[in-house]
Amino acid sequence: MRKFIILALVSLIAAQTYAVSKAQADSAYVREDYAAAAVLYDSLLTAEGPSSEIYYNLGNCYYKTDEIAKCVLNYERALLIAPGDDDIRFNLELARSKTIDRIIPHHEIFLVTWWRSLVNMTDADTWGVYAVGAFVAMLLLLMFYLFATSLWVQKTAFYSGVVLLVLCILFNICAWSQSDKQFNRTGAIVMSPSAVVRSTPSASGTDLFVLHEGTRVEILDDTMTEWKEVQIADGKKGWIEKKVISKI
């Protein structure tokens, strides 16, 4: 009992500390002291761990100070946690419009685009809740099917149960896809004003193209210490120094 009370007090103090620190950061932002607000939001992330709200606020600070690479990075991190948040997505597109590189994504089939949009409607936890809800509803319909005396009720329960089973499977796949994106992050943002992408993981490699700050890349090969093989949205690939990018 004593341990429980101590744990509860520690949790309460931590929550109050977080609330005070966030209030200070919010206050600095309202005063238009964006640099101070950014430091405070960053310290909250260090102390409390990832939060879509704090990443979003931090991105707003960097947008105001015209640090576009950091802005894009934090919006991307916020969107990874809360993929269904329209405000984050809008601000991310706004920040991207201020980057130098204009990369036209390669064409993909409709089903791939549709599936990505579906999965990104919400986060893994919410998809999991939907899956549990569909499963429970399916079990209730199974009870109706087994014990109903009306043939019409049995048929309705059976076909509705099949639909819910399919939805349960679909929701679980969506939850897994979002969870996989969280734990196997391949996206990164170019943080340097400019970065050369080379044909080989060496400074002596042939220059293929140049990327600028704020551009997103996907890491294809993460095995080397100093170099990463990356791909941009139009399908071009090459090697870039690790020090000029930050993982989302």
Predicted regions and their residues:
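SH3/SH3-like beta-barrel superfamily modules
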Residues: 208-242
